[in-house]
């Protein structure tokens, strides 16, 4: 299909593609083996997966041949949230499954990892070599005294050594955690000091945007401020000698050692991820070996349709959950592409160049990058051979309708566009990619299997074709087993279960359409509420950023002391643009035409740039707090922001408005 009307899909998978999809084969098998519906397609399978939750996850475990070294007593020991218990009695190991392809003689010498840096030189690592290095490093970790439950940390870019260190940690039953090297020392310590690591893997620096960035001073500070460290492992990415008192990476990974996989309980911690921490100390989110194993097999094997013939590239850093998700591509036997570099160096086409050169079949990126490519007027389908790219997936923020159209027109008409949405909290997706369903402009294809995703009003009534709170009414295996340093579970409970007892509220505004798709409107904790009507900030961003003069925008809704409501729109202009009366009028008219008069801001204010979290998300709630008069130190955690100086603009604006 080459065009889309309001009621017609932008893309429709053909019969052959539907038949060949893993989710179709799974449904046919589960119909025979477990009584799943044979007819009705994905919608029927999804309904069964939430109505028969235990049976569905048992089927997933069998379909993907999960190796339980001791059998489970039941699938769900307790389904109450929070606190659901999965597969009690079972023991297993995540890393054993991630390296299983190396056991196949026909595949052992094929690439497991394909590493690319800004020189665009490719460095493959075979399955056999990956398994050997993981085995060697796991043995060295044990020799250092690392035991199950000990935390192992990485201050590393997206390089093969990060994957090897993570898998070796998982192999011994340790708990992995990582930060990207563009994080400053305070940001890293806000995270690592909470979990008290015993080993730290570091680089001497990294390359980004054509420049070398030395990190030896930061590493020295981390060593001083992390008293629980027993060992620091030096990876000489910039070629420096190992500092005194550190261990050399090469020495720890040189042996030819068969990996020994510690068999741990299903709910044994695998890793700790972190929230952005914009308004306080980041939440340290603990997810389990078994929960991540099953959830990622489901997501990557069924929803993303990945298998041994695929190459999986997602632009990410080790400080974002998408890195963990990317590495789990190994579970499906897929070759995982690691790109370490700037998304826009030497030009905005950099990611498309990597996709071409590595033969990526699934390429994932941010919605912001897609829109930047559109604004730069590049033509990936014309300028690069993207014939192997079957799917482009986006996350980080909702992909605007113009982003769907641009990918369709400028990459390929027969392109599966998968806008997905989930969260660090589950290291997965609530809604998104389904290879057997059509793609509608501006919509996520469907809720994911095993996920009873609903849109609720404040009273807990499900809504269709109306904006409501994103809730999940059943447990997922990858939901946090706990937060670190939250002994009574109160912080965990208050994060997700305070509004609807026993039901996960994620904090997004969504619409579930009458044809089963999902629309994301933005965060509900930063929602706009004008004249009693709730509006999503993402809708306004999508409308205003169509204008070529607008690089990025930020909208805030502020309840005034006198009972009024002030809704300013802050705009970062493209080079050469001027915010004059004509542009202000064009901005307001664009919003009025695409949304409604109610969405039109009270003021349009130019700013030097838009502040973001360290993982690239717009900061809305702290800006709102600043505009309400909060002190900067109380409104935001300084270590969580990409450019703290930008926030002074909003603090000064608040002071002027109060004067």
Model-derived segments and spans:
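AMP-binding/adenylate-forming catalytic core of the ANL superfamily
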Residues: 154, 179-204, 219, 356, ...
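Conserved pre-ATP/AMP-binding loop-to-beta segment of ANL
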Residues: 109-111, 234, 245-274, 281, ...
């Amino acid at each position: 299909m080459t065009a889309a009307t309001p009621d017609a899909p932008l893309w429709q998978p053909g019969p052959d593609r539907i038949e060949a999809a893993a989710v179709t084969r799974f449904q046919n098998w589960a119909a025979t083996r477990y009584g799943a519906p044979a007819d009705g397609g994905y919608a029927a399978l999804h309904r069964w997966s939430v109505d028969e939750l235990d049976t569905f996850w048992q089927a997933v475990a069998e379909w993907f041949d999960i190796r339980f070294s001791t059998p489970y007593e039941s699938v769900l020991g307790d389904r109450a949230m929070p606190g659901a218990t999965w597969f009690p009695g079972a023991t297993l190991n995540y890393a054993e499954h991630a390296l299983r392809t190396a056991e196949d003689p026909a595949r052992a010498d094929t690439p497991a990892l394909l590493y690319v840096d800004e020189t665009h030189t490719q460095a493959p690592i075979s399955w056999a070599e990956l398994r050997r290095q993981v085995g060697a490093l796991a043995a060295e970790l044990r020799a250092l005294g690392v035991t199950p439950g000990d935390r192992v940390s990485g201050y590393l870019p997206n390089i093969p050594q990060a994957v090897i260190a993570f898998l070796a940690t998982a192999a011994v039953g340790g708990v992995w955690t990582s930060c990207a090297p563009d994080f400053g020392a305070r940001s890293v310590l806000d995270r690592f000091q909470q979990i008290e690591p015993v080993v730290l893997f570091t680089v001497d620096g990294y390359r980004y945007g054509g420049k070398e960035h030395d990190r030896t001073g930061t590493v020295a500070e981390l060593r001083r401020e992390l008293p629980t460290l027993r060992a620091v492992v030096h990876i000489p990415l910039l070629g420096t000698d190992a500092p005194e008192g550190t261990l050399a990476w090469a020495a720890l990974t040189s042996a030819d050692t068969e990996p020994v996989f510690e068999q741990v309980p299903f709910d044994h911690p695998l890793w700790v991820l972190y929230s952005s921490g914009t308004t306080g100390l980041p939440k340290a989110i603990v997810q389990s070996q078994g929960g991540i194993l099953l959830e990622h097999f489901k997501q990557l094997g069924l929803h993303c349709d990945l298998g041994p013939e695929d190459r999986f590239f997602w632009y990410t850093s080790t400080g974002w959950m998408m890195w963990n998700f990317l590495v789990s591509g190994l579970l499906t036997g897929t070759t995982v592409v690691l790109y370490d570099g700037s998304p826009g160096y030497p030009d905005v086409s950099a990611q498309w160049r990597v996709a071409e050169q590595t033969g990526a079949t699934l390429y994932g990126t941010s919605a912001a990058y897609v829109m930047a490519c559109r604004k730069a007027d590049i033509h990936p389908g014309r300028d690069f051979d993207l014939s192997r790219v079957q799917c482009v997936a986006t996350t980080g923020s909702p992909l605007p309708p113009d982003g769907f159209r641009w990918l369709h027109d400028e990459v390929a008409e027969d392109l599966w566009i998968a806008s997905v949405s989930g969260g660090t909290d589950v290291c997965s997706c609530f809604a998104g990619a389904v290879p057997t369903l059509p793609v509608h402009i501006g919509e996520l294809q469907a809720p994911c299997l095993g996920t009873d995703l609903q849109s609720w009003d404040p009273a807990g009534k499900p809504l269709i074709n109306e904006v409501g709170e994103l809730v999940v009414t059943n447990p997922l295996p990858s939901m946090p087993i706990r937060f670190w340093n939250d002994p009574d579970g109160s912080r965990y409970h208050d994060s997700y279960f305070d509004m609807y007892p026993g039901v996960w509220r994620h904090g997004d505004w969504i619409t579930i359409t009458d044809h089963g798709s999902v629309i994301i409107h933005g965060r509900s904790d930063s929602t706009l509420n004008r004249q009693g009507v709730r509006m999503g900030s993402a809708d306004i961003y999508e409308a205003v950023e169509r204008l070529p003069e607008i690089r990025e925008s930020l909208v805030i809704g502020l309840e005034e002391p006198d009972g009024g409501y002030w809704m300013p729109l802050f705009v970062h202009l493209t080079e050469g643009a001027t915010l004059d009366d004509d542009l202000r009028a064009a901005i307001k008219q664009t919003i009025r035409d695409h949304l409604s008069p109610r969405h039109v801001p009270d003021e349009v204010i130019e700013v030097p740039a838009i502040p973001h979290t360290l993982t690239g998300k717009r900061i809305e709630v702290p800006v709102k707090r600043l505009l309400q008069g909060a002190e900067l130190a109380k409104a935001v955690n300084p270590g969580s922001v990409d450019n703290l100086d930008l926030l002074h603009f909003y603090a000064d604006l608040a002071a002027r408005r109060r004067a």
